Swiss-Prot record:
Keywords: Isomerase, Magnesium, Metal-binding, Mitochondrion, Transit peptide. The keyword Mitochondrion applies. GO terms for biological process: oxaloacetate metabolic process. It is found in: Mitochondrion. The lineage of its organism: Eukaryota, Viridiplantae, Streptophyta, Embryophyta, Tracheophyta. Residues 1-30 form a transit peptide. This is Oxaloacetate tautomerase FAHD2, mitochondrial.
Length: 224
């Protein structure tokens, strides 16, 4: 079932909606103030990478930053959804990584430009198989973790999210229509950091899901 759901997600989903700075600890480590409203950005579905794949670092970058996140998979068309009804629009959950080319992000932000190149490249959204909704009793009480090789880098709980899952669905659907197969990346806890070519990322939702990805070089250089 999980395999068919992930394939359906790849084929049906129209967008990936990222949420930035949704953990106070992460905002603090970046030196940012806590957001008053969700910080929303888009990633293309072409950035998906299935479990076991290789995350590609584009030339001439030496590293990418890892950000482990709970992914919410939308189960039906959602527009202007009240927060109290938001959970009815969830089709499932997954573990995802929001891989970020931090050098490109910092440069873009300094120039007032969008961060699409920093977050939207091929393989920049590694994702697990989809967990059916019934398997996740409370999405706001899950432990996320990530290791690089054998070193634990990130460990946090979704209960520490500033904006919880129902509010995110309500807020985002008031701005843009969400379709079946769309994914919301709900933010990352503290501990982000660089991963380099030749390293291996292992990440999971404790008791529910685990993924593993190699890190390699994208052969074709980023055009300048």
């Amino acid at each position: 079932m999980a395999t068919s759901m992930i394939q359906r997600l790849f084929k049906q989903g129209t967008k990936i909606v990222g949420v930035g700075l949704n953990y106070a600890s992460h905002a603090k480590e970046l030196g940012n103030a806590l957001p008053k409203d969700p910080i929303v950005f888009l990633k293309p579905t072409s950035s998906y990478l299935e479990n076991g794949g290789t995350i590609e670092i584009p030339h001439p970058l030496d590293s990418l930053h890892h950000e482990v996140e709970l992914a919410v998979v939308i189960g039906q068309k959602a527009r202007d959804v009240p927060e109290r009804l938001a959970m009815n629009y969830i089709g499932g959950y997954a573990l995802a990584l929001d891989m970020t080319a931090r050098e490109l992000q910092v440069s873009a932000m300094a120039s007032g430009l969008p961060c699409t190149l920093a977050k939207g490249q091929d393989t920049f959204t590694p994702i697990s198989s989809v967990l059916p909704k019934a398997m996740v009793l409370d999405p706001n009480n899950l432990e996320l973790w990530l290791k690089v090789d054998d070193e634990t880098r990130q460990k946090g709980w979704t209960k520490d999210m500033i904006f919880k899952v129902p509010y995110l669905i309500s807020y985002i659907s008031s701005v843009m229509t969400l379709f079946k197969g769309d994914v919301i990346l709900t933010g990352t806890p503290e501990g982000i950091g660089p991963v380099k070519i030749g390293q291996k990322i292992t990440a999971g939702i404790t008791g529910l899901s685990e993924v593993q990805f190699d890190v390699g070089r994208r052969l074709k250089p980023l055009l300048r």
